[in-house]
């Protein structure tokens, strides 16, 4: 768990490496201030827990994040409507986040992370505490996101078997050391 957190902290810039560099799009990200890293590299983060304001409705959670990232009202509304359709949220918009199922909450947090059209989407334990049907649904969402070729998805999860159906490359760490790397078939 500590190594997973360190990897995400290094990518997002919350922590600088002790040695070496983090390079994204041929730019040494560690030379940029942290606030510039998220915007320049268009990072999206889906935390293991949280990410929602539970007393707000689904639509209000989406609107809040959109207002932070998208200045023009018309563009905000277009992006929100696109995500509502993409994630099939139409019947859930007026439901408070606290009343959503675990899978619905996870889908909402992923949609919120996609508001700013990230180039890199970081998913922290996306399958934790979810039933098999919801896991399969999230795997499909991840595969669909990656199929566009416009986004890289980085997933940290303890359940490798859940990941192998939705990744083209896997790196397995044990005590901070790489013990396996390659395609899921390897």
Language model: regions and residue ranges:
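Short, small-residue-biased leader/transition segments that mark boundaries at the very start
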Residues: 2-3
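Helix-to-loop junction immediately C-terminal to a conserved catalytic motif
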Residues: 12
């Amino acid at each position: 768990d500590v190594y997973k957190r360190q990897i995400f902290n290094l990518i997002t810039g919350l922590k600088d490496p002790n040695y070496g560099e983090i390079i994204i799009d041929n730019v040494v990200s560690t030379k940029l201030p942290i606030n510039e890293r998220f915007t320049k590299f268009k990072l999206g983060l889906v935390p293991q827990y949280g990410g929602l304001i539970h007393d707000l409705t689904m639509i209000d959670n989406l609107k809040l994040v959109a207002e932070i990232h998208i200045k023009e009202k018309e563009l905000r509304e277009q992006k929100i409507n696109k995500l509502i359709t993409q994630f099939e949220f139409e019947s859930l918009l007026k439901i408070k986040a606290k009343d959503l199922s675990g899978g619905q909450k996870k889908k909402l947090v992923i949609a919120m992370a996609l508001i700013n059209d990230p180039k890199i989407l970081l998913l922290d334990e996306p399958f934790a505490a979810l039933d098999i049907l919801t896991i399969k649904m999230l795997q499909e969402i991840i595969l669909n996101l990656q199929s566009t070729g416009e986004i890289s998805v980085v997933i940290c999860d303890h359940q490798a078997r859940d990941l192998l159906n939705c990744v083209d490359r896997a790196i397995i760490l044990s005590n901070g050391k790489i013990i396996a790397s390659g395609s899921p078939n390897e």
